Regions:
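Interaction-mediating elements
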Residues: 1-109
């Protein structure tokens, strides 16, 4: 039962765009972890600029105000290869769905 916490900057994601992000995350979880469609738990946080702080760049990656910080909690025991595949799948799907740079996706498992 994964729990996804999606953090975005207030005003950057309207209802339609956040729905695309949400759907992309759930699709990646279903595809990579094989979670059932009805295993769906997400919390979405829109934070004001003074509460959503990040560096403009780090280790060759550049971040815009479209950055999404995603925390996913699930029961341990999945192999490293599966976790890495999940990171890649989420990044690819969310970047395409939201129209953001792949750099603008920070994921913590």
């Amino acid at each position: 039962m994964p729990l996804a916490k999606i953090h975005v900057l207030e005003g950057r994601y309207d209802q339609s765009r956040i729905a695309k992000v949400s759907g992309a995350i759930q699709s990646a979880l279903m595809n990579t972890l094989r979670v059932p469609r009805e295993d769906f738990f997400q919390l979405i946080f829109e934070l004001p600029k003074n509460r959503f702080l990040h560096t403009p760049s780090f280790v060759g990656m550049h971040y815009s105000d479209d950055i999404i910080i995603l925390e996913i909690s699930f029961i341990q025991g999945r192999p490293k290869e599966t976790r890495l595949a999940l990171l890649k799948d989420i990044n690819t799907r969310v970047a395409a769905a939201a129209g953001i740079s792949p750099d603008d996706m920070m994921i913590a498992l």
